[in-house]
Amino acid sequence: MNTLVLKIDAILSKHLKKQLAPYTISSQNTYVAFAAKKNGVTVLLYKSGKLVLQGNGANALAQELNLPVAKTVFEASNNSQDIPIIGSDEVGNGSYFGGIAVVASFVDPKDHSFLKKLGVDDSKKLSDKTIQQIAPLLEKQIPHQSLLLSPKKYNELVGKSKPYNAISIKVALHNQAIFLLLQKGIQPKQIVIDAFTSQSNYEKHLKKEKNHFPNPLTFQEKAESHYLAVAVSSIIARNLFLDNLDQLGQDLGYQLPSGAGSASDKVASQLLAAYGMSSLEYSAKLHFANTHKAQALLTK
């Protein structure tokens, strides 16, 4: 997906709005003055005068609209690594046991040599042992913001008749991690989130969050394979999740598995038999189907 970021004046802004009037869409971002979507390309005009075009046809649409395409900034590939980037990723949302770890990291081009020497890559391709070795080095060298939502807090916030669902809670965590990192004086040229929902859905849930920032976002599937900043966040988040999972297991006297398969059902049923539902409230995400499966195992 291509992302173009331009700075346009009031005259060009007025002309742009007129051209794209038939393609207007709503945006929940309070910093966006005008939004449209044409030919699969999302167009966001910010109150600051910054214009963002996102989509595979961004360059073609920019030419059609007579925009200054010479100011093209980014393309979601390794060619975009020559700019300072914040990348955000989460780990744990698909695991029954353990919390959710979200990390936003700032990677400058000067960090690339260090990261390549460490072998930083998509954390999903790395063993847990390697991640646990690399993560402390990244935490020391790379500016980042880590957030961990414990299972207990997750269960208070997520579920039927509760403030969040499984998607909106991740929106809140990503937004807060990036916001706090920006508060440290970080000045990225691009902010990339490993896409877990559509941009429109993200912005819908973002509306109810207290903290906001004006920087445009790039949503990229499997972003950890395209951006070093996201790969760094993925590694740090994975390590944070594993540490939390291990600590929860030590507290309960059980080895808690990652994931949401039959192994989780079995351990959950053992916890229910030993300690009751309070043990799962403390260590697991209750709305997962594993809870009912574990209860069913007790009756056999």
From Swiss-Prot:
Its cofactor is Mn(2+); Mg(2+). CDD domains: RNase_HII_bacteria_HIII_like (cd06590), RNAse_HIII_N (cd14796). It is found in: Cytoplasm. The keyword Cytoplasm applies. One of its GO terms (molecular function) is magnesium ion binding. Residues 83-300 form the RNase H type-2 domain. One of its GO terms (biological process) is mismatch repair. Its main location: cytoplasm. One of its GO terms (cellular component) is ribonuclease H2 complex. A divalent metal cation binds at residues 89-90, 194. Pfam families: DUF3378, RNase_HII. InterPro entries: RNase_HII/HIII, RNase_HII/HIII_dom, RNase_HIII, RNase_HIII_N, RNaseH-like_sf, RNaseH_sf, TBP_dom_sf. NCBIfam families: rnhC. Endonuclease that specifically degrades the RNA of RNA-DNA hybrids. HAMAP family: RNase_HIII (MF_00053). Belongs to the RNase HII family. RnhC subfamily. This is Ribonuclease HIII.
